[in-house]
Each structure stands twice: as C-alpha cells, then as structure tokens.
C-alpha cells in the first residue's frame, strides 16, 4: 500500500526548464541524460542547501536518464551529508555480558574455559560461572512525521530527506518515518531498521497531496512508538503546524511522550503555538543542510 501511494505520488515530474532556475544546473547537467557527479560535488560543497534542493528536483526530472542517475546518487549523498556532522549514535541496544544465572544467551566463547574445566572434572558447570550476553534496552526511539500536504517542492523534499537520514543515524533500528496529509504513508515502521538510503530515496518520490490532519498524524506516531521499549520516545513533526482537517491536534498530542516541531524559519508561528500548547519544543529550520 505504501509502495503504491509512493508510485502514484512520484508520477509528477520536473522539466529541465524548471530546473534551470538553479545556477549550478547547467554545470551539473550540461545536456539531456547527463549528470556530472564532480560538478555536483563541487556545487554541494559551495552551497549545500541549494544543491540538495536541486537534487530533490533531479530525482523527479522529466528527463528519464537524468532521473535515474539522480536517484542512484540521492540516498548516498544525503546520508553522507548527515554523517559528516553525525552525532553520537544512540538507540541501538548495547550488547552486554553478565553471569548466565542472570539471564541472556550463553556466550560460548567467553564460557569455553569454564565448560572445558567442568568436562575434565566430569561435572556440569554452574550457571554463575558461565557468561551470557543480551542486549540492553535502547534509550531512544524516534518517529518522524513529514507533512506532505499542499505543495511539496524541492527544498521541502530535501529537508525531509535530511531529517529522515539524521533520525535513522541517531536511532538506526528504532526509528519510524511517516509521510502524512489527510492519510499516512509509513515509509519505515518502528523497529524495522530500514536502510537510510532506501528511506531517503522513497522520500524523494513524495509530492504534495491533500489537507493537513495533525491529529491523525499524532495518533499514527503514538501507535508506532507504542511498539518500542525505549526509555525515551520522541515525535519529530516536520511541518508549519497549521492543521486544516481532522480533530484538535493538541488533544491527540497528549498520547505522545515528547514532541519536537521542526518548522520553516520563515513560517513558524503556528508551529511555535502548537509546541507551546502541548509542552513541546519548536526548532526553526532554515534549509535542508
């Protein structure tokens, strides 16, 4: 169902003439069917926001060959952008070792000497002398909600892709990514550990659609995060915070442990009000990078 929705969303395309508004476009794609990766890398270094915005348009190019080249590049580029300033990884349970009588799976390598000694004596090893291993509880779970209602241009797509890659870098296993309007597309479900590049590529296929039902989005996030055993569960809302359909979002938000609204810096008033009303935080976003 999600794949079908993404396929339908991705049918809209961007012409070369539309992309010519970007100064670097002619150098990156000097002719039909060409994508110069070296020129792209230079442009990305000089102006990350502008170049990521262009990348979001390239993956939806009318030029089929250019589109395929951009799609082969997109996921890797966005993930690399995130990794260059990557925070300490969290959210993956840490492998820990303990006495086997405290539970867990037997660690044969660490217990081998004890087992051999017991066999030599002709008796069974005691659990307290054996070593087991298990995973400690992850301390962070994230759910990223991407508002895809209305217009979904290059800059919004690029910002959403970077936000998703950053979330998956922070909590690689325990992150869900959902695109919503008056319905929802679950791009990555909680605990799926879906590859970040795959998620980014799916996000780049999104196009604007429908009205903005924040309450529905919050309920969807709560259902995803309920699957997690993490000690801290954060919902990230990438939106201007302006609900145009559905129930009162402030009521639905009470089911969320923690809410952070990622709002466009030039249109954050509603997002700030929403965050304030539910005890959340609002962070201004001025560009993809």
What does each model-identified segment do?
Residues 115-118, 170, 206, 224, ...:
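Conserved, well-folded catalytic cores of nucleic-acid-processing
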Residues 128-131, 164, 222-224, 245-251:
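A generic local structural motif
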Residues 110, 114, 162, 201, ...:
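Solvent-exposed alpha-helical segments within well-ordered globular domains of core cellular machineries
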Residues 1-138, 195, 289:
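Acidic/polar low-complexity segments with low predicted structural confidence
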Residues 96-97, 148-153, 206-210:
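A short glycine/serine-rich beta->alpha loop
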Residues 112, 137-193, 196-238, 243, ...:
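Von Willebrand factor
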Residues 241-286:
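VWA/integrin I-like adhesion module and closely mimicked acidic/polar interface patches used
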